Every structure is written in C-alpha cells, then in structure tokens.
C-alpha cells in the first residue's frame, strides 16, 4: 500500500463552512472513485489555514496517479491551494 500525503492552504477560503461542505460533498466522493482508493482522512485546518489529508491506495502507481491530480500549486477548489503532495509507502497500519 502507498499513501498520498497532501497539505493545503485554505487561507484564501473566507468561509470555512463552504470549504467543509465542498470537502464532504465533492472532494471526498471524488477521491472514493479514484482507482485503487482504500481509505482517506481529511483533517480540519489549523488556525494558520493549513489542512492535511492522507489517502491510501492499493499500489504505488495508483497513489502516484492520484497525487498528480493534486500537484503543488494546484487548486482543488476556490481559495484552496496545494502546498505539499507526497507519495509514501505505508510501513504499518492498525
């Protein structure tokens, strides 16, 4: 298994509720449809506006393909910018 670790800057999104609604109604359902998706976790942004997600995929290839859609500098929704996107092998799970 491999995971995509993504960090976003949400400081351009003035209404956190709009961002949360888009996350729940668009981003998460779309992630579930990506090839090889196994699980995903999206963490609320900190006070500095940085949000983090971890999406787990069955293969490195599927994780890399998903990460390409969330490249640094891209904007998954208005007011949100990807600042970090990494693919890593999963070392352990519980």
Regions found by a protein language model. Name each.
Residues 1-51, 58-69, 78-94:
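Short S/T/G/P-rich N-terminal loop/turn motif that feeds into the first structured element of a domain
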């Amino acid at each position: 298994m491999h995971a995509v670790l993504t960090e976003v800057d949400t400081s351009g999104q003035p209404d956190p509720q709009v961002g949360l609604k888009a996350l729940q109604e668009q981003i998460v359902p779309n992630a579930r449809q990506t090839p090889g998706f196994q699980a995903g976790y999206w963490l609320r942004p900190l006070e500095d506006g940085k949000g983090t997600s971890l999406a787990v995929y069955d293969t490195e290839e599927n994780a890399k393909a998903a990460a390409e859609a969330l490249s640094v500098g891209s904007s998954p929704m208005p007011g949100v910018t990807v600042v970090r996107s990494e693919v890593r092998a999963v070392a352990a799970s519980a």
